[in-house]
């Protein structure tokens, strides 16, 4: 991943002036979603690119070593070898961007990836995921333990109460402490946008998280009623762009929750390309958090190569 975001001092004057035009954001989202997807002859290339942005995730209460081991194997070999060969991509080393697990499963992921001879990063959720409603000391210790166990990326959740009550200094202080607890690990800050009340709050929370040194800002835990949506993404991407223009810091973006189909993944790539440009279409600055998306991408690539849709037994389990 790219160098850490340096962060800045908290700029309350900037935050206080923020006001998002809700109607304009909705119009922009509708414009983008109404456009045609990538042309058929280019779809396979774009879908393979999408694979390299996926944080392949398992966050279930019944996760075991075998689940995590299978996840890691799929992360290393995301697309069947013969399909890659048919596309002349078998020598490109295509993998997912990372695997993402609960803190208690980090050791399992590190062990499985090491056994597979693979250097894919291990990301861990932390800070009382998904609600973030535990004591700060506990949340910080959870980060430290995940890093000690081998996680090189930490997906933290913010305390949504601080956003809803306008406690921007407290939010900045908490995320700054998360950043410090991560050490050399990269910090991805989950805003849980479906629980922030307004698009203006989404923009403000995005700014505060970036000022505090977040390397990525992320839409959702995937556990909220409303997860990644285009209106929310547009607001976050504009905040990333404005922060870059003002500070020179490039911060990554990660939508998560409800992104299940290949078509949806292409729409997200197009959105990022339009709002931030090709510079952001790299795993250093763009990720997609997903558990079932990869299976649909592989099915679409199978169809592109063979001309027919795969039966369930045609593709390995993910």
Swiss-Prot record:
Q: Which reaction does it catalyse?
A: 2-deoxy-D-ribose 5-phosphate = D-glyceraldehyde 3-phosphate + acetaldehyde
One annotated GO molecular function is: deoxyribose-phosphate aldolase activity
EC main group: lyase
Question: Could you confirm whether the keyword Phosphoprotein appears in this record?
Answer: no
Active site per database record? 155, 218, 254
Task: Provide the E.C. number(s) assigned to this enzyme.
Answer: 4.1.2.4
Q: Name one GO cellular component term.
A: cytoplasm
SUPFAM superfamilies recorded: Aldolase
Q: What does this protein do?
A: Catalyzes a reversible aldol reaction between acetaldehyde and D-glyceraldehyde 3-phosphate to generate 2-deoxy-D-ribose 5-phosphate. Participates in stress granule (SG) assembly. May allow ATP production from extracellular deoxyinosine in conditions of energy deprivation.
Tell me its family. Belongs to the DeoC/FbaB aldolase family. DeoC type 2 subfamily.
Put simply, this protein is called Deoxyribose-phosphate aldolase
Q: Which organism is it from?
A: Mus musculus
The primary gene name is: Dera
């Amino acid at each position: 991943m790219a160098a850490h975001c340096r962060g800045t001092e908290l700029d309350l004057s900037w935050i206080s002036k923020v006001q998002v035009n809700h109607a304009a954001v909705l119009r922009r989202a509708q414009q983008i979603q109404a456009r045609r997807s990538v042309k058929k002859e280019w779809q396979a290339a774009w879908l393979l690119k999408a694979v390299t942005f996926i944080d392949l995730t398992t966050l279930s209460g019944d996760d075991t070593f075998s689940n995590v081991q299978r996840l890691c194997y799929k992360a290393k070999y995301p697309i069947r070898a013969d399909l890659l060969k048919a596309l002349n991509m078998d020598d490109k080393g295509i993998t997912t961007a990372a695997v993402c697990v609960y803190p208690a499963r980090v050791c399992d992921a590190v062990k499985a990836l090491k056994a597979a001879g693979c250097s894919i990063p291990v990301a861990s959720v932390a800070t009382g995921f998904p609600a973030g409603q535990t004591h700060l000391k506990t949340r910080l210790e959870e980060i430290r333990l995940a890093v000690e166990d081998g996680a090189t990326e930490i997906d933290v959740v913010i305390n949504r109460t601080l956003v809803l009550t306008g406690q921007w200094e407290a939010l900045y202080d908490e995320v700054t402490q998360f950043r410090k607890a991560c050490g050399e690990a990269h910090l991805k800050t989950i805003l849980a946008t479906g629980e922030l009340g307004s698009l203006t709050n989404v923009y403000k929370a995005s700014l505060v998280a970036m000022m505090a040194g977040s390397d990525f800002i992320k839409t959702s835990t995937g556990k909220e009623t409303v997860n990644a949506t285009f209106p929310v993404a547009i607001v976050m991407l504009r905040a990333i762009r404005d922060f870059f223009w003002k500070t020179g810091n490039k911060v990554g973006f990660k939508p998560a929750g409800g992104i299940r189909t290949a078509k949806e993944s292409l729409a997200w790539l197009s959105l990022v390309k339009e709002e931030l440009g090709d510079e952001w279409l790299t795993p250093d600055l763009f990720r997609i958090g997903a558990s079932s998306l990869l299976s649909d991408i592989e099915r679409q690539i199978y169809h592109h190569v063979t001309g027919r849709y795969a039966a369930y037994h045609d593709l390995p389990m993910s």
